[in-house]
């Protein structure tokens, strides 16, 4: 395992999925703060701004895009990787593209997720 100083705020409401993704990211050498709700995510973001936000396409009953946009108002320039099922709403895909959000569809094998995270972190805004 290679250790990196890059930090990730992981926002996934499902505890089982959150734990699996956190474990994969930590195994990839990332410093991960894993939370299950938007309120806690805001608190953690303000305490220690991460290098990357990874968020599911839905958090509780809130679209992940809306939650990520809200978090980005708290930390402008925050890199965002949304993970989840395929998005079939062209307007949402266009808004995500304009915002610079990245998307990674499930299933997300650990090695592929780690590679995508590295790619997003290496990108310049």
Regions from the PLM with identified roles:
Residues 15, 36-40, 111:
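Acidic phosphotransfer microenvironment of two-component signaling modules
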Residues 66, 84-105, 111, 115:
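Alpha4 helix (beta4-alpha4-beta5 surface) of REC/receiver domains from two-component response regulators
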Residues 14-33:
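Two-component/phosphorelay signaling modules centered on CheY-like receiver
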Residues 43, 65-77:
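Short amphipathic alpha-helix used as the core "switch/output" element in two-component signaling
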Residues 48-59, 81:
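Active-site beta3 strand of CheY-like receiver
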Residues 113-125:
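Receiver (REC) domain switch/output surface
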Residues 34-52:
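Acidic, metal-coordinating helix/loop segments flanking the phosphotransfer/catalytic sites
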Residues 55-69, 87:
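Conserved phosphotransfer microenvironments
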